[in-house]
Amino acid sequence: MRTLVRLALAVGPLLLPQLGWAAIPANPCPFSDEGVGAAGDLAQVGEQLKTAKRLEVLAVGSATMFGPEASLAPGTITSQSFGSLVNPVAPTSATLTQPPSEQAFPLQMAKQLRTLVPGLTVEVTVRGGRGLLASEMLELLHKELAAKHYNLVIWQTGTVEAVRNLPPGEFGQTLSEGAQAVQDAGADLVLVDPQYSRFLQTNSNLDPYFQALQQVSAMPGVMLFRRFDLMRGWANDGGIDLERTARSDREKAVVTLHACLGRHLARLVASSIRG
């Protein structure tokens, strides 16, 4: 089965329609409240902001969490979006140890939150790596929660499970365990679903994994950031679209994407706090 999946991934770009390259649009990521987030109330975050004006954030996920350069490395969904024939999820995973870029969307979120909430101090710790399963991220999550108190956890996951066609039930159980661990640690959780990719949508059955994320987002203190729907909306409405970006603009497009995601994620968190 894994051999067949790798073959499908390799030929995936050939199954997609021919795309015309375009420059980065003037308004790459217009803001829309509709469909950006689902469920949840970040009560712990809100209370922390009222009493201390300081937010400790743990971001756990794939290479994307470390910034544009890491997300463009061979073997990622972003590189596949640009036509790479490399299997985006290698048979073995790799935990990254370098510090995240200031352009990474979790740090861009922090930057925007400081603007939205004057006087706020935000510290972000990023953990994760390329090709990690949710179960591997859960181990990182447990380790970090035991070592330090965080107010907010951002957990980006689901792509590897979908590409490998792993049991959605096990994925959902892993998410539930992680959400409970975050709650027990006195923090709130924002889940982040896979990024939009025509390649990924063509070669994977994403729905069961989206459903698992949605179900867990109904738990207390959990929200779902609908990155996939957000990016698809931008692509369909003439906004940023990695798969149709001119080769000369690709690096700039990924930097722009991280800034857009950070801005929208900050708006989602801030609106929940005020709600």
Regions found by a protein language model. Give the residues of each.
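Catalytic His-Asp segment of secreted/periplasmic serine-dependent ester chemistry enzymes
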Residues: 197-275
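Loop/turn elements at helix/coil->beta-strand transitions in domains of secreted/extracellular proteins
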Residues: 53-56, 120-122, 148-153, 184-190, ...
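Oxyanion-hole/transition-state-stabilizing segment in secreted/luminal serine hydrolases
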Residues: 58-60, 65-74, 111, 115-120, ...
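Active-site segments of SGNH/GDSL-like serine hydrolases
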Residues: 156-159, 179-211
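Residue-level recognition of beta-strand->loop/alpha-helix junctions
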Residues: 126-128, 193-194, 226-229
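Second-shell loop/turn segments in exported
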Residues: 64-71, 91-100, 131, 161-168, ...
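N-terminal secretory targeting modules
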Residues: 1-60, 64-98, 118-120, 253-275
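Extracytoplasmic/secreted envelope proteins and their assembly/folding machinery
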Residues: 42, 106, 110, 138-142, ...
